[in-house]
Amino acid sequence: MKFLFLTLFVCCFIAVLVIPSEAQIDINVSCRYGSDCAEPCKRLKCLLPSKCINGKCTCYPSIKIKNCKVQTY
């Protein structure tokens, strides 16, 4: 039982280290709804889903984009 628990713990620890979390980027585009952000994110080659947070579009970067702030939510 201890071996099973230890194996599970090690697997979870490795998964946390190996699988990086990506932050959303603020693309400096105003919005009212999440659907307003789909086209600007697509134009900048970002990944969906895009979100409208506090009146600003955010999306996940697929490549490094210059002049974007990294936001953590």
UniProtKB/Swiss-Prot annotation:
One Pfam assignment: Toxin_2
Keyword set includes GTP-binding: no
Leader sequence segment: 1-23
GO cellular component, one term: extracellular region
Tissue specificity comment: Expressed by the venom gland.
GO MF annotations in UniProt: ion channel inhibitor activity
Compartments it resides in: Secreted
Modification after translation: Contains 4 disulfide bonds.
Keywords assigned by UniProt, alphabetized: Disulfide bond, Secreted, Signal
InterPro entries in the record: Scorpion_toxin-like_sf, Scorpion_toxinS_K_inh
Family: Belongs to the short scorpion toxin superfamily. Potassium channel inhibitor family. Alpha-KTx 27 subfamily.
Domain remarks: Has the structural arrangement of an alpha-helix connected to antiparallel beta-sheets by disulfide bonds (CS-alpha/beta).
Official protein name in the record: Potassium channel toxin alpha-KTx 27.1
